[in-house]
Amino acid sequence: MVDLQEKQCTIVKRNGMFVPFDRNRIFQALEAAFRDTRRIDDHMPLPEDLENSIRSITHQVVKEVVQKITDGQVVTVERIQDMVESQLYINGLQDVARDYVVYRDDRKAHREKSWQSLSVIRRCGTTVHFNPMKISAALEKAFRATDRIEGMTPDFVREEVNALTQKIVAEIEERCSQQDSRIDIEQIQDIVEQQLMVVGHYATAKNYILYREARARVRDNRVEDQIVEEAPSEETFEVLSKDGSTYMITHSQLLARLARACSRFPETTDAALLTDMAFSNFYSGIKESEVVLACIMAARANIEKEPDYAFVAAELLLDVVYKEALDRSRGDEDLEQVYRDHFKRYIMEGDSYRLNPELKNLFDLDALANAMDLSRDLQFSYMGIQNLYDRYFNHDDGRRLETPQIFWMRVAMGLALKEQDKTYWAITFYNLLSTFRYTPATPTLFNSGMRHSQLSSCYLSTVQDDLVNIYKVISDNAMLSKWAGGIGNDWTAIRATGALIKGTNGKSQGVIPFIKVTNDTAVAVNQGGKRKGAVCVYLEVWHLDYEDFLELRKNTGDDRRRAHDVNTASWIPDLFFKRLQQKGSWTLFSPDDVPGLHDAYGEEFERLYEEYERKVDSGEIRLYKKVEAEDLWRKMLSMLFETGHPWMTFKDPSNIRSAQDHTGVVRCSNLCTEILLNCSETETAVCNLGSVNLVQHILDDGLDEEKLSETISIAVRMLDNVIDINFYPTKEAKEANFAHRAIGLGVMGFQDALYKLDISYASQEAVEFADYSSELISYYAIQASCLLAKERGTYSSYKGSKWDRGLLPIDTIQLLANYRGKDNLQMDTSVRKDWEPIRSLIREHGMRNCQLMAIAPTATISNIIGVTQSIEPTYKHLFVKSNLSGEFTIPNVYLIEKLKKLGIWDADMLDDLKYFDGSLLEIERVPDHIKHIFLTAFEIEPEWILECASRRQKWIDMGQSLNLYLAQPDGKKLSNMYLTAWKKGLKTTYYLRSSSATTVEKSFVDINKRGIQPRWMKNKSASAGIVVERASKTPVCSLEEGCEVCQ
């Protein structure tokens, strides 16, 4: 049934004439296309399903046409064919759509070769095909504007437009016949104006002139007004699409695209600048992907000048994601509906894309689709989207299947699989994740909702002094690494070089060759093809092979006794530091001669160690080595500075303060030194990580405690769910995780939070903020675990734990003080909150998780959500970060905001930052109070970083990935730094940072202004006499920019 509104519609033909709209023409065109593609003869009836499809598509196109005409838009034959094409794709009829496109292209080529084809000479000298429809459209617009017409165009106007168009086209044809079928665009515009005035439409002529001057374009119906004045510099390039077809792109078209990407930042970004930069890299036949890349690179190049360009680049990359996953662009009107429909189709077809098959049956997909907030896609900066695109989005044969919100929802669904009300909790989890309040660790993001849901971050295992077990652990490493886990191995039990092997009566080669095999296994097995596998090997400092162990990462020496790819860490008992203080000796043993020593700690370790030393003196133990503690310490520090390894971790505080001291011993930490759990031959310790984003919980006057409480409650629930959903590559890992249910809740964006509060990291205020924020996180994490225990029950090994004995993390400091003595422990023990309600909850309900808190490095997830890593100070205010997704310029957005307010952010300031390697201290025009707030990592005295870490450690039941910074070689300062870390009660340390592998590009620094003679200058110049004194070059740690496994 054709309604009255449809009968009143008219469209513009290719000759520029208005004609009545006829839906039958659409039906007939579709029928012809179906018959041609499906090889159905004209005399044969169409199958019922095909006829229904044609009617449905016709109805959708008619509905869209009528709506646009009702809205006052001009609809052309070409636009209707675009709609038909779009509907064929939406309805999954790609084969018909493809043939229809080919048919249209053939017809277009035929028209352009016809006698009616005329050429228009543009101002830039290029020619384009003359299109009468554009004259009709421009005339109608002018009449509508003059007569203030709303809704459909009246018949008398259409008749006048048709008559005028015929006269204009006739005159153009007449002139072209005298000018070799070509006419200048100025002549066309003159003819239009002349004809309007000849017939007496003076007001319309005036509006048309204004219309031309304003260079208006009819964007809504995708018609470029050929009569509108063209820019003299307009260039055109042919672009090659992925499917092999080509199209033309102009400077103004690219400007329109980039203007949309810049529209959120009109005051700080310049679309014209980006257009010029991108267009300068174009060439005829440029690939479509290269067009996008040129635009993104133009935006990237300006990030150092204006951080908002990071969001412009992100929006451009988002368009790539949308086209790849949804076959849509960001500006498409139907994007939102296609987005939601694609999500539901993606989940329903998930079996083909490695998704967990349960997802499609256990959730209300309509509710989940409607819960997605697409505007949250715009929260990401460029580096965040690039990381997601490269490594996190699920893909099929190189094509991304996910967008940011679909990615978050897939993760949320995977974490809600064991909930009773799955849809409710999936939406709750999604809202927390997609607003950047909390982010799970990378393995969870990789694998949640997938068929193999290995979601755990960290695995800790101990190697027995047995060949079968040695290779079993190496094999386990491969399996764990395959599914994106980071691994810590304890190798202390392996007998030392020269020890007797009773079975063969031979001598052992020691632990080093086995670590070499471990190294090569880590290299061979990458993490699901997404990032490098990674292992950290631990050795206690009394092991006879320890001195060789120190040199594993050296670049010189016998390469058969080097392990360049694994990380190494020293497991140091307190007794070693006591001997160091006493300037005493230290004895190295083979583990098979000192049974029980590795499992002992505190006073028991001291008793056993001294007993074994007496056996050395009596001759009972013959394989040993005595060294001066100071000499060994000096070698430890030397290797740490030269190679960045072995990291220093502390055995006694890790065990004495462990909540699980009743079930075993902590023998090592994990890959990133924040996890401290028992492991044994029968148990591989497992921990699941996630981090709270402090930035999202900052108010003007401090932390939003209510919001933080809610975030932590939901986050702990997610982390606990991981344990039950997880895919376990080994039996030992599964048994340990189910028995103890350890989770590691951490933080990120600590430095950003300080910036928002105008606090310097090197201040007592920062120390107090570290203390208070950690206390709140500890308080609400313990509370959440208690409430989960009430709902789900305690973990199975709860009985006898410190929790069960009424000891909270804050209480265990006294246990450590009792063993060490007050001179060797300098930890604050003050509290702000009333902890009695938490103690009461534990007594009543117990705990769901044996351990709760650990601060991971968050190297990758902090990049995704755009905050500073973990608890790290700002590295530099302008630097280049390298990871598997490439190199990214990282400016300090908080600093730039401050400098803008002071009116001193300009090209010279950027030049200064580059010249001074991202530091403010030597830039005279920066006020001192700004310099103090914005100290970089190497400018902050280590005491501040260590005191902040100590305040956190009093509340944390595990550890923290704590990097330390040393700007210049200074053995005494380095020694004091690590001795202070021990005395402050820290359990572990992480990297020692001495310098960076990547720096900011300085090729544009003004050497004349700096007064420096470049090396290539052969002749003596006025600047040749300048003496530039530079600090001696420090050794460069062969470190990566950040941990790429835990987070």
UniProtKB/Swiss-Prot annotation:
Active site: 670, 672, 674
PROSITE patterns per the UniProt record, alphabetical: ATP_CONE, RIBORED_LARGE
Pfam family, one: Ribonuc_red_lgC
Gene encoding the protein: nrdA
Family from the record: Belongs to the ribonucleoside diphosphate reductase large chain family.
InterPro entries: ATP-cone_dom, NrdE_NrdA_C, RNR_lg_C, RNR_lsu_N, RNR_R1-su_N, Rrm1
UniProt KW Protein biosynthesis keyword: no
This protein's name: Ribonucleoside-diphosphate reductase subunit alpha
